Amino acid sequence: MSPSPISYESGIGRRDFFCSGGSAILGSLVAALLGGAKPARAQTISGNVPEVDRATVRVVTDNYHFALSPSGKIGDVEVGRVGFPLSDQPPERVLLSEFGLSMHLETQRGNETRNVLIDFGYSSPTLLNNIDILGIDPAKLDAMVLSHGHYDHFGGMVGFLRATQGKRKPKLPLYIGGEECFCSRQFTAGPTPLNFGALDRKAIAEADLVVTTAEGPAVIADHAFVTGHIPRATFERVLSPTRMKVGIDNGLGCFPDKMPPDRRPIDWAPDEFDHEISTCVNVKGRGLLVMTSCGHRGVVNAVKQAMAVSGLQKVHAVLGGFHLAPHNEDYVRQTIKGLVDLDVDHIVPMHCTGEPFYEILKAELPKKVIRSYTGTKLVFGA
């Protein structure tokens, strides 16, 4: 069953993905890149967020894989591991890992099943290899979400779209947090700024996707929701490893007139990640799952936004990248306290979280932390 028709209520700000009006040159560029398609509008949340009976999160791509890690049950969470893909023939392939993140979400409610791909990792060979080994069928996807415009989360997208052309459902929704997602970026953590890429608008247009902006909270495939913009409401601060450029260069980048007025005149500026979104699920009898992907806006901020959007106070699990690797121990401990104060049942750090966070949590709150690797399957609910 396909996602519900997309609608958009007033009251939640929107910057159209597609450009309308403007100069003849800009209009021609938009038509060439986007095929003249109409803007897509996210189905906003009115009333209660969806509730599901069961949610399964599969880590498609993460930083590393430990083939000997055992499966089992941690608290009320079923944890499945993938070792070697053995058969009656010698194993020719294994799961690949890289500094990137991609997750697959499958939810059940009664007889309904929904499948969502969240982020695309760093490279398409890794993504395609792992999807095949893990048995994830692109034809079953009901939606895709791109959490933010960093290459280690969208780098595998174009190759994935081309490899699965004609195999996916037509007009598959791709949710993003806004036009800023398309801005060109440079990596600035080293001595010299280096190219960190930009989303390929032409490839996305050719893939027959419905690119859907969700600057506010939005329902995903009837079963899940995204937070929309994540306010900075706690001690957490953005420590950006990149800077972004507003403008179009050789068909890549973000349209200035689709950016907030205070961002339009910017050449290069530090990322504030106003476009970053988290994907969430309300599991019956358990509470919220919050998938932060990279957590540039702060993992505690993301959880608080999910709670505010849903009206739910119970947080069952927080999983994804928390972007704590660049921070010192005091900040890491403050983040742990913030999650403990929210009474989170399970914490599953991935990707850019860093080892200090895991080691402290494992030593002090071992029943809360779950170690995750590429291929790990986490089952929440009945």
Each model region followed by its residue ranges:
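Active-site-proximal beta-strand elements of phosphoester/diester hydrolases
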Residues: 56-60, 116-119, 224-230, 288-294
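Active-site metal-binding loops of divalent metal-dependent hydrolases
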Residues: 62-63, 120-122, 149, 179-180, ...
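N-terminal secretory signal peptides
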Residues: 1-13
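Pre-active-site segment of Zn-dependent metallo-hydrolases
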Residues: 91-99, 107-143, 158-159, 166, ...
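Active-site HxH/HxHxD metal-binding segment of metal-dependent hydrolases
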Residues: 142-215, 228-239, 340-346
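Cap/insert and terminal regions of metallo-dependent hydrolase folds
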Residues: 143, 150-154, 173, 258-376
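Divalent metal-coordination and catalytic microenvironments
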Residues: 105, 119, 131, 148, ...
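Zn-dependent metallo-beta-lactamase
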Residues: 10, 20-35, 39-112, 226-275, ...
